[in-house]
Amino acid sequence: GLIPGAGGTQRVPRLAGITQEIMGFLMAGTPFTPKKALSAGLIHEVTDKDNLIEAAKKYILDGGKAVQPWDEKSYKFPGGLPYTPKGMMIWGAASSSLRKMSYNNYPAQSAILSALYEGVQVPIDAGLRIEARYFTKVVMDPVSQNMVRSLFVNMQALNKGARRPKEFDKYDVKKIGILGAGLMGAGIAYVTAKAGIEVVLIDQDQENAEKGKDYSVKLLDKALSRKKTTEEKKEKLLSLITPTTDYALLKGADLIVEAVFENREIKAEVTAKAEAQIAENAVFGSNTSTLPISGLAQNSSRPNNFIGIHYFSPVEKMPLVEIIMGEKTSQETLAKTMDYVQKIKKTPIVVNDSRGFYTSRVFGTYTGEGVAMLAEGIKPALIENAGKMTGMPMAPLALADAVALDLAWKVTTQTKKDFEAEGKDFPITPMYSIMEEMVDKQGRFGKKNSKGFYEYPENGKKYLWPELSNLCKESEDQPDVEELKKRFLYIQAIETAKCYEENVLTDVRDADIGAILGWGMAPWTGGPLSFIDMVGIKDFVAEADKLAQKYGERFTPCKLLRDMAAKNESFHKSGNSSQAA
């Protein structure tokens, strides 16, 4: 959320010139390898740590200068002056790239470009003053303040175990069992073995279990081809994964992670088989993304050791793990689980049990709002562009396809059955009708079968399914894109506030970090609760009421928000990010 304000925007171009690569380095934070930095002229020499002192001495003895290049009388700007006709061509392209990359949501990136453009046209002392002014402007911007608080201060706190119960000793997980060798189970096996933990990967037949291990082989072969690992490290990691059908091999496991299909009967069966083999104090974690943990724990002989461990796909890339506390989950089990998550170098958030927990529940509002807009007759392309313009990593309909429409429909139909079993009315909305049409009648499951809201040709780019305009008749009057952007952000923030009110969330850090890392909520907001604070609680509630009048009760602010508005409170009070003010 900040700019490199200690001279970075002025020294870098004077060392390496103004190129597209340098623009990416400064504006997007694109990392440079030492070799790349050397070739760009950003550093003098690359050496290993054992030879560091000798290299420094040699640099001095060989006539290394204390004078910076730009202070030399003979200095020439690398690649030619940036304000010549040739040099000026780069700025137009940079402005276009910035717009495409950020949709003007990030003040820091705009400030970097301005500091570069203005600073390289004057002597460096004046350039540094220009940079300092832009740095001050960015520091005072609420977007930067939100990002620093969420992505630096609060994320560091969570990574260091801020939510871990302190009264328990460190739990050293040395062996785990993974039940289910599908995509999730295979990914969990890889990140766990990478942390040096022995893995027993179980599936119903040996071939599937072997395929699960092969996933690690493919990832390691790719890393090997990119020189990110060695053959020795590859073999060491693979030696830690044992694919099998034999539950007896779970003996001695400190932790079990169940990653089978979202089916209560199958989960109950594998739970019983695993618990028959493991120690009384071992932790049993379920990777369910939607089924309530307390219900699954009823099939456990030790519900106090039962906990939800929700990974995100692909496991090896996604940095978040959502830990779900069941009604009977003990604090010791939470502490043990957090020690494991810390060991595999993921960021943990802790939530209480409910349908969809936190991340799946709120994530669904983003894609659901996209489908609702479609039902209103809003053009699909406008919906998709508005989603990306809010700062979301993917457009809503494309994201729904990627997650799988049939999976979302299964969750919806299961929820409907559960509502009916509890004697509650399940609302049949236009969204429900569209999903029923897409999955049950059209057989469009999303990217997985190459047809969803988009078509996925074997050779070529995906494109919106042309028949969508017939499925949902387009309205003649199309809304302003700013209205759509507002809906996408507000619906996520409102549902998050409901989670906080219902005690699903108990810490605002979990809410904000979980949203950004879990489903990619626009990082410039700092997360959904930071977004509410940035808008201002009174203004947020007033605007939400307007949206509710126009689009339905899903936008109606919950009692917590109304109470906070009456007292003019905020979620992040000064000096304390763990609870509402």
Mark where each language-model region is.
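N-terminal glycine-rich phosphate-binding loop for ADP-containing cofactors
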Residues: 2-581
